[in-house]
C-alpha cells in the first residue's frame, strides 16, 4: 500500500453499491470505499445516478488506514469519469 498516498488520483473499479456508499477495487490488490457524502456536494438520493457496479472511474485518495488496510476515496472534487492521472 506504500505506493498509494493520500491526495493521489487513482483509477478504480466499482465492485459494490450500498445505501451508504460504493466499494471500489484498486489495482486488484486493495479495496476502498467512496462514502455517499464523497460522491457529490449536493444531495445524493441514488448512488446509481452517478456510478454503477463495473464502472472504471478515477477517485481521490482521502485517507489510508495502514492498520485496517481501509482506503477512503472521494469523487466529488474531480471529473471522475474523464480525469487523466498525471
Predicted regions and their residues:
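Single-stranded RNA-binding regions, centering on S1/OB-family and related RNA-binding modules
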Residues: 1-86
Amino acid at each position: 500500500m506504500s505506493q498509494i498516498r493520500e491526495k493521489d488520483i487513482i483509477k478504480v473499479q466499482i465492485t459494490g453499491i450500498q445505501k451508504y456508499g460504493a466499494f471500489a477495487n484498486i489495482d486488484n490488490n486493495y479495496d476502498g470505499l467512496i462514502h455517499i457524502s464523497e460522491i457529490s456536494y449536493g444531495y445524493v438520493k441514488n448512488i446509481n445516478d452517478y456510478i454503477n457496479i463495473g464502472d472504471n472511474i478515477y477517485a481521490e485518495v482521502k485517507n489510508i488506514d495502514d492498520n485496517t488496510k481501509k482506503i477512503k476515496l472521494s469523487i466529488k472534487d474531480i471529473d471522475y469519469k474523464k480525469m487523466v492521472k498525471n
